[in-house]
Regions:
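Alpha/beta-hydrolase fold catalytic core
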Residues: 1-51, 73-76, 113, 294-306
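Active-site loop/oxyanion-hole signature of alpha/beta-hydrolase fold enzymes
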Residues: 33-39, 73, 79, 83-120, ...
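Conserved HGGG/HGGXW glycine-rich cap/lid loop of the alpha/beta-hydrolase fold
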Residues: 41-88
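Gly/Ala-rich beta-loop-alpha elbow adjacent to hydrolase catalytic centers
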Residues: 121, 125, 129
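Flexible "cap/lid" loop of the alpha/beta hydrolase fold
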Residues: 131-134, 141-173
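Conserved alpha/beta-hydrolase catalytic His-Asp/Glu region
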Residues: 171-228
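Conserved serine/cysteine hydrolase catalytic core
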Residues: 205-260, 269
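Catalytic histidine-centered segment of alpha/beta-hydrolase-like enzymes
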Residues: 273-282, 286
Length: 306
């Protein structure tokens, strides 16, 4: 694992492309999945072929606000969910990759993404996308895994250290106080205006006394069931990977994922990007995703892939 850690660059006005993306029309919705209300946003024409975007640990649907409109501009229906325990979705007593994969498929249907959908996941979301491919493969058009760490055996000690970085449920006396404590895990330099946007959507009032807390369930790791086993046969959809040059997915990990999923899975590297590629090199990420989706839309799947 490697990460780029720098001081934040000086604040500057958000560029036109970013403000235009945030102003793009979006539908907000929710669907019940196994007793939990799962929220999502959607862009582009309902009923069109499209994509479900899956965030990483402690993140939420709004991490994609400046990415999704670019994909929708290509005529796609694009939905971004907040998985249970994240964003404005409900918390659960227990969490699992299997449950999150069910939420992804439920949102694809509720948001009217025409079947079969593409699934794109960042970090933890890439793990969810991979499991969804193993479980529902022939019902998917393909998955893109963005800078997801792929380990053999138990997670290494540095992953446990990262988990501790998500905190323990502390509250703060004001919105300003909690926003001042917003941190990325792992820390890295990102675009200040993107950071400010996602931070603003990461907090909420916690009680009538005026305390503020994070939207994600900070007991998430304690409530996680054992990880899903890897697939025992090749997945039945196409697979691509996007790696950040200074991110968490090494070339060795990319090879490990290819082996697990049983697909050739090209890997595109985003130069100069850290793990949080949505926040530091978003336009390069958009270009990579557009290229993959355009290629898949225009060509037939390989033999052995539905």
């Amino acid at each position: 694992m490697s990460a780029v850690i720098h001081e934040e660059p000086p604040a500057r006005p958000a560029p036109q492309w970013f403000t235009a993306a945030l102003a793009a029309p979006a539908d907000d919705g929710a669907v019940d999945v196994a007793g939990a209300r799962i929220t999502y946003r959607a862009w582009g024409p309902a009923g069109a072929p499209g994509v479900v975007l899956v965030h990483g640990t402690a993140a939420h649907a709004r991490w994609w606000d400046h990415i999704a409109p670019f994909l929708a501009a290509d005529g796609l229906r694009v939905a971004a969910l907040s998985m249970s325990g994240h964003g404005d979705s409900d918390w659960r007593d227990r969490y699992s990759i299997r449950q999150w994969s069910e939420e992804v498929m439920a949102v694809a249907s509720a948001a009217r993404v025409a079947a079969p959908p593409f699934i794109i996941g960042h970090s933890l979301g890439g793990g969810v996308a991979s499991y969804t491919a193993a479980r529902y493969g022939s019902a998917l058009a393909g998955i893109v895994v963005i800078d997801t760490a792929v380990h053999e055996g138990p997670p290494p000690p540095e992953m446990t250290t990262m988990e501790m970085g998500f905190g323990t449920g502390r509250t703060y006396p004001s919105r300003e106080a909690i926003l001042a404590r917003f941190r990325l895990v792992p820390e890295q330099q990102v675009l200040p205006y993107v950071r400010e946007h996602i931070a603003a959507w990461s907090v909420r009032p916690r009680d009538e006394a005026g305390q503020w807390g994070w939207k994600f369930d900070q007991s998430l790791f304690a409530k996680m069931d054992s990880q899903a086993p890897p697939p025992t046969e090749p997945v039945r959809c196409r697979v691509a990977m996007v790696r950040a040059q200074h991110g968490m997915m090494t070339a060795e990990m990319a090879g490990r994922l290819r082996s697990r999923l049983g697909q050739p899975a090209p890997a595109i590297e985003i130069p100069a990007a850290g793990h949080h590629v949505l926040l530091d090199e978003p336009l390069s990420l958009v270009t990579a995703l557009r290229a993959v989706l355009a290629n898949w839309t225009a060509t037939q799947p390989r033999d052995g892939v539905v």
